[in-house]
Structures are given as structure tokens and as C-alpha cells.
């Protein structure tokens, strides 16, 4: 294909962002493209709205896995791209369109060129929620085609084009959503003594939650509790019967996640008693930490440093969440950041990753597969 063909593919995918487990058009686009490739060594299996694509090696002794996530976000795009999202209120604001284009680029090469070992491409739905990695990992297809090691990348607006960033060990945090519902007794604003005001209770709860990181988490560990949304009440002269708090929890260790949740539950119970209300906690979508296995990560870093067109940066761990962590929990492998140099960050309505990173990533991964898959 022409050198810029995968930029065109990225732009077509950018037009059709879809939420988790709703990626029907995306799956159809991927299948239609894959069907144009030589089929002699390819085997394709669908899973919900995702795909497994196996490239059969000529004399395989192992299977190498590459995962690309495929879902978009509920964000109204503000890029002014000529290829802006055609789905109102949805956007590829986390670079998954780039991830897919890169995956298709590498897949195209190995559909056309022999490799000794098997290569498994996993196009995974629902990374942004409710989480596709864990159920995909537990699927019969994955059990049948289980790779011996696996890796993935994620675009990074803060790093320049031509760079990748990674480290051995912990890369991304443990993450959990947080939803807290409060129900009290509403009433007229002139008679507060006859009510249990859930706006006041919610405000008290938000303040108390912020003490957890400061006083209940080891200072040498890290945790973040973010309350991003509060809902309560209906109009200005009615005391609110209900309130809802929505946020996230992020910790660098599983032990801290357990401790933080224990403290949240204790504090919520205290608010329930103090404000004579009913409460409910839902942790929603929870992701395991991304932990890069030392040996394979070190080997990849050494390989990448030998490439003249890639700058390898050893980064620090981040409080980002990624359900690829579930795959790395069961399969040796790693994840790395791909520099895409954008003024705006991930999950921003104006994110514009530099498309020059697509060919750089395709080249690096193709060379690495040839290195690993022909040993």
C-alpha cells in the first residue's frame, strides 16, 4: 500500500467513533479491510464487537500478541478536522483510531510476508468502559490462541514524534470508578428542620474523601481520589432529597486500592448515620495495574535503542488506567507510550495526534516482530 494509506485509514476510523461494545461500524470497517489482504495465512474470528486475527507462521514455536483498542469516547469533537467525527457527541479522543491504523499496518505486512512464528492481532472493544480486556482474555478464542507474550502501545501527546517511552515494572495505576448515591428527605427551603439535605451531605462527603490520601495512604505510595461530578436537587427553593457523587480512584499498588475503598466505605457509613440518610456505593469499572514484565521489556528497549529512527525514553509510572493490565496479569509482555506531540491531551475535545507517528510505529513493530518471530 502507499506509504500514507494508513493515515487515510486512521482518518476514516476517526469519523466513526463508537462507545464500548457498540463498535459495530468499526468492526465492519476492520473486517472489510482485512478481507482485502492475502488470506493464505490469515484466520479471523469475531468476538462481540472485537476481532482476533491470527497470522499463521511457517514453522511456529510461539505466538506473539499485539493488542489495539477500538472504542471512542462520549466527547463532542472540537478539532475542526475535515475528517471530524460523524457521530454526534462521540470522538476518538484517546487515539484508538491511531492504534487501529498501526495494527492494520503491521497486519498488512505479515499478510504479505512470511514469518516463522504465529502473530495474533487483538482488536479489543470497550477499553474506555465497561472493559473489554478481561472478558476477551477469558474467551474460548483467546484460550485457544493464547499468545506466549503480548504487547500494546498508547499514544502520548506529551512526547515528541519519533519517540517511545516505557519502563520496566509498574507503568499504569490500578483504577476504579466511584459512584455514591445519597437519599434523604427533601422539602421546602423555608423548613430545613423537617428535611435531611443531601446537597449538604454530599459536600461534607466530598471534603472527607480528600482526607483519605493525606492520612490513610503511605506517603511513599501514591493515590488520587477525584470527584468529577456532583448532582443534587431540582430547583433553588427545594431542599434536595437525593444527591450523587461520581469520580475515580487511582493507586499505584493493589494494597492501597483496598485500603482506600475501606476508608471510603467507612466515611460513607459515617455520613449515612450523621445525616440520617440512605447511601449506596458502586465501583463501576475497575482496571488492574499495567505492569511491564522485566525481561521482555528490557529486551524490547534494547532492540528499540538500536533503531536509528526511534528515540527511547525511560519514563516514570503514571496514574493512567488501562484494562490491558488484565492481559499482562496473565501473559508476559509490556506496553509503551508512542509520542504523537499534541498541544491537547488525551480525552480532550481538541486532541490532534501527529499522524507521522503512524508510520514510525508500524516500522518499529514490524521490525520487532520479524526479530522475535524468526528466532
From Swiss-Prot:
Active site per UniProt: 69, 128 (proton acceptor)
GO biological process per UniProt: diaminopimelate biosynthetic process; lysine biosynthetic process via diaminopimelate
Known catalytic reactions: N-acetyl-(2S,6S)-2,6-diaminopimelate + H2O = (2S,6S)-2,6-diaminopimelate + acetate
UniProt enzyme class: hydrolase
Keyword Amino-acid biosynthesis included in the entry's annotation: yes
EC numbers for this chain: 3.5.1.47
Listed InterPro entries: AcetylDAP_deacetylase, Amidohydrolase, Bact_exopeptidase_dim_dom, Peptidase_M20, Peptidase_M20_dimer
A Pfam family it matches: M20_dimer
Function field: Catalyzes the conversion of N-acetyl-diaminopimelate to diaminopimelate and acetate.
Family (UniProt): Belongs to the peptidase M20A family. N-acetyldiaminopimelate deacetylase subfamily.
PANTHER family per UniProt: N-ACETYLDIAMINOPIMELATE DEACETYLASE, PEPTIDASE M20 FAMILY MEMBER
Name of the protein in its database record: N-acetyldiaminopimelate deacetylase
